[in-house]
Amino acid sequence: MMTNAAQITKQRNSGKRHRACERCREQFELNEPYFLLGASSWHMRCFLCAQCMDPLVGTTYFQFENRIYCEHDFKTLYAPVCAKCNEFVIGQVVHSSNNSYHLACFTCDECNVHLNSQIAYRYQGTILCFLCNQKKPKMRIYNCNKCKQHVDNSDLLTYQENPYHAYHFKCTTCKKVLESDARTIKDDLFCPRCFDFKCEVCFDCKKVIDPQVEQSIFTMNKHWHTDHFRCATCARPFFGHEHYEKNGKAYCRDDFLELIGHHCFICDRNVGGGMVHVFGKAFCPECYRCRGCDKVLHYKDKVMELDLMPLCKKCLGNKTFQKALKYKSL
């Protein structure tokens, strides 16, 4: 990797074959100025960033794997980010516990002593020198089952009942290096994002149902959080109680009867399938009575119509009732 090491020279008539541009492969004209970078040559117009194609003449540039980049694109594509100052690391880099640091930033988080010549200790997400680590209250110590080194809680991944540094593993699906929040399905490890893709989604809240920590129910050909499977009208969860379906929605008994039933002509109650339908009206069993004697009728009883109300056979043959009815009609 080189920066600003190119020289501007001119094609001379030496009798040898003219140089060719590294980008366009065209030869340089006689006395044409060009960039000479190591063993490669470039037209002035072809000396561009391989990523954004911006001109690099007069700017800071980097050569990496025989390609040239502007400073911004090189940092974005290849430069690590310091875990302490969050700036790009150009030049010497220190790697520790799956993080990168500037040499000057690799210091103890307590006393700021440089850690370049001593062992760094991880403690609850911080980096400490030996003395500062000794002052901290001791917690349960885990040693990685793979590298046998100490595992800080922030890096701890328990897999098959053994402690590991999480960064020793990669996601089964996307191959991303795992962190301590990795999830397990059978013996396979996944990052949280890929784990979510393996889970069902609640039809009500549209969020992932975590089968390892959340209860769910499968009904109406859909998955639900247990407390999200509820009546479409009153929103009370069913929690395993009986529900009724209509047009793809679930209802409790009261709201279902309200939705599909008929109201009693007398008391205005809704009793669903127990209603008696006669003369264009609906009656609940308690209100289905004779218009004449107020006797409770059975739905199989033969009745006659009087003012669009039921009249029992006995009242119809009663002479006293017939006289009263005749007098009323006068």
From Swiss-Prot:
**UniProt subcellular location:** Cytoplasm; Nucleus
The protein's UniProt keywords, in alphabetical order, are: Cytoplasm, LIM domain, Metal-binding, Nucleus, Repeat, Zinc
InterPro entries referenced in this protein's UniProt entry, alphabetically: LIMS1/2-like_LIM1, PINCH-1-4-like, PINCH-1/2-like, Znf_LIM
Query: As annotated in Swiss-Prot or TrEMBL, what is the tissue specificity of this protein?
Result: Expressed in neurons and intestine.
Task: Look up the record and report any one GO term of the cellular component aspect.
Answer: focal adhesion
Record's keyword annotation contains Zinc: yes
One biological process term in Gene Ontology: cell-cell junction organization
Q: Which PANTHER family match?
A: LIM DOMAIN-CONTAINING PROTEIN (PTHR24210), LIM DOMAIN-CONTAINING PROTEIN PIN-2 (PTHR24210:SF7)
Look up the domain of life of the source. Answer: Eukaryota
| Pfam families found in the cross-reference section | LIM
Residues of the LIM zinc-binding domain: 21-73, 82-132, 144-194, 202-255, 264-315
Question: Which GO molecular function terms does the record list?
Answer: metal ion binding
Primary location recorded for the protein, binned into one broad class: cytoplasm
Q: What is this protein called?
A: LIM domain-containing protein pin-2
